[in-house]
Curated annotation (Swiss-Prot):
<dbReference type="InterPro" id="IPR001509">
    <property type="entry name" value="Epimerase_deHydtase"/>
</dbReference>
<comment type="function">
    <text>NAD-dependent epimerase/dehydratase; part of the gene cluster that mediates the biosynthesis of the host-selective toxins (HSTs) AAL-toxins, sphinganine-analog mycotoxins responsible for Alternaria stem canker on tomato by the tomato pathotype. ALT1 also selectively transfers methyl groups at the first and the third cycle of chain elongation for AAL toxin.</text>
</comment>
<feature type="binding site">
    <location>
        <position position="174"/>
    </location>
    <ligand>
        <name>NADP(+)</name>
    </ligand>
</feature>
<dbReference type="GO" id="GO:0016616">
    <property type="term" value="F:oxidoreductase activity, acting on the CH-OH group of donors, NAD or NADP as acceptor"/>
</dbReference>
<feature type="binding site">
    <location>
        <position position="41"/>
    </location>
    <ligand>
        <name>NADP(+)</name>
    </ligand>
</feature>
<comment type="similarity">
    <text>Belongs to the NAD(P)-dependent epimerase/dehydratase family. Dihydroflavonol-4-reductase subfamily.</text>
</comment>
<protein>
    <recommendedName>
        <fullName>NAD-dependent epimerase/dehydratase ALT6</fullName>
        <ecNumber>1.1.1.-</ecNumber>
    </recommendedName>
</protein>
<dbReference type="InterPro" id="IPR050425">
    <property type="entry name" value="NAD(P)_dehydrat-like"/>
</dbReference>
<keyword id="KW-0560">Oxidoreductase</keyword>
<comment type="pathway">
    <text>Mycotoxin biosynthesis.</text>
</comment>
<dbReference type="Pfam" id="PF01370">
    <property type="entry name" value="Epimerase"/>
</dbReference>
<dbReference type="InterPro" id="IPR036291">
    <property type="entry name" value="NAD(P)-bd_dom_sf"/>
</dbReference>
């Protein structure tokens, strides 16, 4: 598909996934309008090497910024949506840090932000497709695992979480937020009149790989990387933590979002107004593989001795869920990158900035 320098509205560009999507979109020569809660954050994006490189050619795409302080406010995206052809909505709170109120800080931004994006797109005749960053947590309740032998499909759904469960802790609130946002998308698409665009949801599992805006190893593992390269960076015990050991590479996630903008007849998601389709990105691993990969891929001084960067030797209890990733692999035109490449690229960044 010739993108004809069509304009992409992108949210969440300061996050792990959103920034990678931004770089991928610029390299694919899309013009991008980035939504920021604070316009001052544009400086960190513009000063980053990947963005500077993407904008360095004489025929470089255009990168602009617009401030939307609160995406939960009705009409928040109305003016930002002007002249937009594609929307990529990556912005959503993650379950890290301290929260005073799970409802207002995790769930509302995810659900209201998504519905406000969809409403603004519906009111903008130029919009052809909305791509949304969802999650496997939107379709799998990790407290009630699928029966053995079950393969989870991107078309699967689960009901919204009961309020008492959603408010239990940050992990439950995050899963509740992703579930409700996905279900709200389904409801919007099925009930909207004369919908001129279609919707594609990208559902990553844990996202491992470089965080290009990170300034320190601590920044790199401030997020899902903590369960990957974090295993050899964190020295304390993981305690009784039990984790779904299923992940995907940031490169695959970013490329999936941008490839999903292609709506030609011969691609995975050809244009079909008024529909909502999805794909899952997932690759199973074992936590004990991480140290093996590090010791095989990196110099001995980086993982052995008191001055070594990769001194962590702990692990956590784990389990696997089987996911159908065929739609994602068809979208990308190849197999997904596995744990070796995920840890190798994460480790290279750690060594580069440590």
């Amino acid at each position: 598909m010739d993108n004809e320098r069509r304009l992409v509205l992108l949210t969440g560009a300061t996050g792990h996934v959103g920034f990678a999507v931004l770089v991928e979109a610029l390299e694919a020569e899309y013009n991008v309008r980035v939504v920021l809660r604070e316009i001052s954050k544009a400086d960190s994006i513009l000063s980053s090497e990947p963005v500077k490189n993407a904008l360095s050619s004489t025929a470089a795409p255009e990168l602009s910024f617009v401030e939307v302080p609160d995406m939960t406010v009705p009409g928040a995206f109305d003016s930002a949506m002007q002249s937009v052809t594609y929307v990529v909505h990556c912005a959503s709170p993650i379950n890290r840090g301290k929260f005073r109120d799970f409802q207002t800080e995790l769930i509302d931004p995810a659900v209201k932000g998504t519905t406000n994006i969809l409403k603004a797109a519906h009111a903008t005749p130029s919009v052809l497709r909305v791509v949304i960053t969802s999650s496997n947590s939107a379709i799998v309740n990790h407290n009630i695992l699928p029966a053995p032998g079950t393969c989870v499909s991107p078309s699967d759904r689960q009901p919204d979480y009961p309020l008492d469960v959603a408010m239990h802790d940050a992990d439950e609130a995050y899963s509740a937020a992703k579930t409700s946002a996905l279900n709200a998308t389904d409801t919007f698409v099925s009930s909207a009149n004369d919908l001129r665009f279609d919707v594609v949801s990208i559902m990553p599992t844990f996202v491992f790989g470089p965080k290009e805006l990170a300034k320190s190893p601590g920044d790199i593992i401030d997020g899902s990387n903590v369960f990957g390269i974090g295993l050899v960076l964190i020295k304390q015990s993981w305690g009784s933590l039990r984790i779904e050991a299923v992940s995907c590479h940031i490169d695959d996630v970013a490329q999936a979002h941008v490839q999903a903008l292609n709506h030609d007849e011969d691609v995975q998601f050809p244009f079909k107004a008024g529909t909502h389709r999805s794909c899952l990105l997932a690759s199973s691993f074992r936590p004990d593989e991480v140290r093996d990969i590090v010791e095989r891929e990196f110099p001995k001084e980086s993982w052995q001795g008191e001055e070594a960067v990769f001194r962590g030797k702990g692990s956590y209890a784990w389990y696997h869920t089987d996911y159908d990733v065929s739609a994602a692999e068809k979208l990308l035109g190849r197999k997904l990158k596995g744990i070796v490449e995920q840890i190798r690229s994460s480790g290279l960044q750690v060594l580069r900035i440590a």
